[in-house]
Amino acid sequence: MWVWLHIDQFFCTCKGRLIMPVWLDAVPKKAAKVPRPDTLRWLLFLVFIILSGIALTLWGWTAERTGFVFWFTALGLPFCSWGLIFGLRRFAYKAEQVGAQSRNVERALLIEGEIQRGQRCAWILISSVQHITGNKTGVLIKAVENSSPATQVSAPRGCVSAVRYAALNAFQTDLDSEIISITSTLVAQVQKITELLPKDIPCCLMLDCDDDIRSRVEEHFRNELLAKTGRLFRLLAGKGLAAFDAWLDQHWEQPGILVAVTFSLPAQPDEGDADAITLLILSNRKAVAWPDTVCLHRPEKGQEAGLEKTLNRALLWAATDSVALKAGWHTGPAIASGSGWNMACENNGVVFSLSKDNRSIDPALGYAGRAAPWLAIILASAACNDNGPQVIAAQPSSNEEDVWVTVITKEEVRKESSGNV
């Protein structure tokens, strides 16, 4: 069991980088207290050994039954044998005791290190959203608060019949031109940020979009980035919050940024869905040029039925008490149809109103699919500036049960981080 500790440390470290996700549940349980040898049993065993020694000596002794040799054989030899066995057992007990204590110390250090790694976070330098309701977070938040539905009957590019959803209509009529236009707009925002950053800072790109437009979006976006910023952005293999989670581990050793871009433009949307395009630029160090940025903490993945533990773990990563949370934001059909999220909030002791401050963005803005977590994060980050820590629960895909929970706070510096961007 304890070999796991060393295997984990061996495989998790690659050129100084931790490459495995934080998973506290994989840490072995605390070693049980080693039971002390039962004194009464050993005394009874001593009596048995001595009686057996006397009986065997009397039965097999043919010489005169007197003298030192006789009595040592009858009494001393059994007693010495018992003492040797008891000494070995006592030594084994002490060895087990020391081993258990050392394993528990090692386990505690591992947990402490994993928690410290889990509490890595990123600062949101800038965010942007394209939605039919509007492009400003204030407008979107007001729409969510007023529950003003943005859905309307539209004809998606991949459907014969019309569907009631929150569509970006321009993308349905002239998709290629709109992709070029919005890409230029987003890259221009990235350029404004990179101009204020050191030239040698590592830059990563998380680009998530629908499969039918992926090749066009990736090629054009990467070319635009290189042409306008003059920087080489490393495209991450992962998508969504899973990519952000991995980025915190794989690119933590030195200051860097992550450009997270999501195009959610489904060709065949369901009723109540939404088109949305989001952009966030995240830094794994506090940025001097942006002193008032909020902090996105490591997300935790779970399922709707087990969100109590997921929320508890997300609070641990944020090093935040549940009573400090001021509001909640959630999106996704599994969360909307179930009671797991409300129960998780109650059981973790949140104090904000679950009817007023626990906001679902889907009734007003529609369900944005792969962009839904980032849309909720953008709204929560804007609210955090004015209202304090926010918690987000988001389901990235209606076809999967995974739900991500994360916390946004105003954070100055983390223990593991060093230096600024």
Where are these regions (language model features)?
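Aromatic/basic-lined ligand-recognition segments
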Residues: 272
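Surface-exposed short loop/turn segments
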Residues: 264-266
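Conserved "HGTGT" condensation-loop signature of ketosynthase/thiolase-family condensing enzymes
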Residues: 2-252, 269, 278-421
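A short, hydrophobic beta-strand-centered structural micro-motif
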Residues: 254-262
